[in-house]
């Protein structure tokens, strides 16, 4: 049980397999989405280690990439010869950054990802808001330092108010694109905040849609494709 022994996540073992995929499926390594992801990966013959930023918490505030580095080493120490990673949405961004950093990852699935690192955010309850950006924080960190990131144009509490406005009061953040589109339109990206996908080893699968209701993942994937061609 990895969760008890190392605090990394939940392992779903596939009998006889010496390959593993790190699954980044949401806010809990043992919820329905994680189990569905693990089941699909099992059908494809691999062990699965599901991880999340926190237990029942999808906040991304300087999430230490060392956790994924430790998970890779744990998997290698426990008989896995090949290691992949799969993530969705913000966790798809996490998967790309990790794969660009750790050469032991030789299979990467990024589902509806961004091609750059975002400012850190928290979820919960604060001043009537269910999500808010964290000033000066990135979504990810490495060696104790936040990664360079694209800041949100909106601060708390306007950040959540914009979500409410766009979703007609439902607060369904997965149906709100203004945070991301407006923030990108506010300034040019720096090279430091872009994900160096050209450093990813092995196979890379990028999956998205033009009509994504959350952010412009189709555009992000095209930019990554151009970066790889260059």
Where are these regions (language model features)?
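Single conserved hydrophobic/aromatic residue that forms the stacking wall/gate
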Residues: 1-8, 12
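Short beta-strand element of the alpha/beta-hydrolase
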Residues: 17-26
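Short amphipathic alpha-helix adjacent to the substrate-entry channel of hydrolases
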Residues: 33-50
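Alpha/beta-hydrolase active-site loop
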Residues: 59-78, 97
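Short glycine-enriched nucleophile-adjacent loop
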Residues: 92-103
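Accessory cap/linker subdomain of secreted extracellular hydrolases
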Residues: 109-199
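Short beta-strand/loop motif that positions the catalytic acidic residue
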Residues: 200, 206-208
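Conserved alpha/beta-hydrolase "acid-adjacent" motif
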Residues: 213-223
């Amino acid at each position: 049980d990895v969760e008890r022994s190392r605090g990394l996540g939940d392992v779903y073992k596939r009998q006889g397999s010496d390959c593993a995929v790190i699954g980044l499926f949401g806010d809990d390594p043992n919820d329905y989405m994680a189990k569905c992801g693990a089941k699909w990966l099992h059908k494809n013959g691999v062990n699965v280690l599901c991880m999340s930023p926190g237990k029942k918490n999808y906040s991304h505030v300087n999430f230490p990439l060392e956790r994924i580095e430790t998970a890779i080493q744990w998997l290698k120490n426990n008989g896995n010869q090949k290691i992949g990673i799969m993530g969705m949405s913000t966790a798809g961004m996490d998967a790309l950054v990790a794969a660009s950093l750790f050469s032991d990852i030789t299979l990467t699935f990024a589902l509806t990802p961004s091609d750059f690192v975002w400012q850190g955010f928290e979820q919960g309850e604060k001043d009537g808001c269910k999500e808010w950006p964290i000033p000066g924080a990135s979504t990810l960190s490495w060696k104790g330092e936040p990664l360079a990131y694209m800041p949100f144009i909106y601060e708390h509490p306007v950040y959540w108010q914009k979500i409410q406005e766009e979703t007609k009061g439902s607060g369904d953040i997965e149906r709100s694109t203004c945070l991301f589109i407006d923030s990108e339109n506010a300034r040019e990206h720096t090279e430091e905040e872009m994900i160096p996908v050209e450093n990813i080893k092995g196979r890379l699968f990028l999956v998205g849609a033009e009509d994504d209701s959350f952010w412009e993942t189709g555009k992000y994937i095209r930019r990554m494709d151009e970066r790889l061609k260059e």
